[in-house]
């Protein structure tokens, strides 16, 4: 396999076209902690760092704030108007569950059908309304349908007034 073929295989969609949709939910900040107790520490930190804003700014947190969660988080950023975040970083426990490369890829690159079916609207609402998201269910990836996901999605501003970043965290007991 030459370099071009290897690159194309790494960048190909990973979704299983026969997989069932995931469950996507959104919560108001004041509802999230009670609804998602396994993520209470992250939600408390997020709520604390909001200050008077609806959504905290990424500059108001430090990576060390997530110390016990490092292995379980993915970081992503919205680039432009489309609510299709590009993944920047994945912790080793998340990578172990997913078993495919996420860094530098968008949701629509990894799962184009599910992006259109669920995630465009889901991330649009999180981004527009500062909601906290949850994605759960069986991983809809080829050969990974046995793996369970339960991923919290926390929105962050990035120096402005709009949501530009997400911190995704896989539940520790699901990893």
Where are these regions (language model features)?
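Sensory/regulatory domains in signal-transduction proteins
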Residues: 2-14, 22-175
């Amino acid at each position: 396999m030459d370099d071009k073929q290897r690159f194309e295989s790494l960048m190909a969609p990973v979704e299983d076209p026969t997989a069932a949709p995931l469950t996507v939910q959104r919560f108001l900040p004041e509802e999230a902690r009670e609804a998602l107790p396994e993520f209470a520490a992250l939600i408390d930190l997020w709520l604390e760092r909001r200050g008077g804003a609806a959504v905290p700014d990424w500059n108001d947190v430090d990576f060390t704030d997530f110390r016990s969660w490092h292995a379980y988080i993915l970081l992503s950023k919205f680039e432009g108007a489309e609510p299709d975040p590009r993944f920047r970083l994945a912790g080793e426990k998340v990578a172990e569950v997913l078993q495919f490369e996420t860094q530098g890829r968008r949701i629509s690159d990894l799962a184009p059908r599910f992006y259109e079916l669920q995630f465009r609207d889901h991330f649009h609402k999180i981004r527009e309304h500062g909601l906290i998201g949850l994605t759960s269910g069986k991983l809809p990836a080829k050969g990974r349908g046995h793996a369970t996901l339960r991923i919290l999605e926390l929105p962050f501003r990035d120096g402005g007034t709009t949501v530009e970043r997400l911190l995704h965290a896989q539940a520790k007991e699901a990893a």
